[in-house]
Amino acid sequence: MTINYTQARENMVEQQVRPWDVLDARVLETLATLPREAFVAESHRALAYADLELPLGHGQSMMKPVVEGRTLQALKPQAAEDVLEIGTGSGYLTACLGNLAREVVSLEIQPELAAAARARLDATGLGTNVRIENVDALTWDTDRRFDVVCVTAAVASVPARFLQWLRPGGRLFVVRGASPVMEAVLHVNDVNGPRIESLFETDLPYLVGAAPAPQFVF
């Protein structure tokens, strides 16, 4: 069966993403334009636009399209802004961020995922303003600051270092808490003081090294 990906992309936006209160025109245009199927394993390509998390291996998964849409809308990356992505994954959200912002630095701890994402970005021509680094975000050291920080996997609690990478006025998206009910939040480095906005409930795999400590029952 031949899949009409253009139609599938339109259906994803109109039937999944927009009804979940994603109304930002730039975000909707990005999701309606970028080929999500090019970032999905061949075995899952028929499900590229389904309302599902898709496995990436290494205990990670690709966010549902609705979560990607809400993430991008909350962060509002602008054309003159720089983005730090923590967890490259498939490279699809990386491409979306790159389409909306000036530059994306994306950190991926798994070398296989980093290499595959780089290849997909190059093959689609969507990676010209993207740099992928095969590093652990929990130990990565940089003096650079970013307008947007996007954490694509969950954390039990938000590492202080992630917040330190924000410029004044910067925004950080992260999913925090304990499975199965986690909270997506937006940290804003406001000039009047940092603030946190609660966005929605979801459930994501944990960032490597950021899961809760095991609970021992005696």
Q: Where in this protein do the model-derived segments appear?
A:
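Class I SAM-dependent transferase core
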Residues: 1-84, 92-96, 100, 113-115, ...
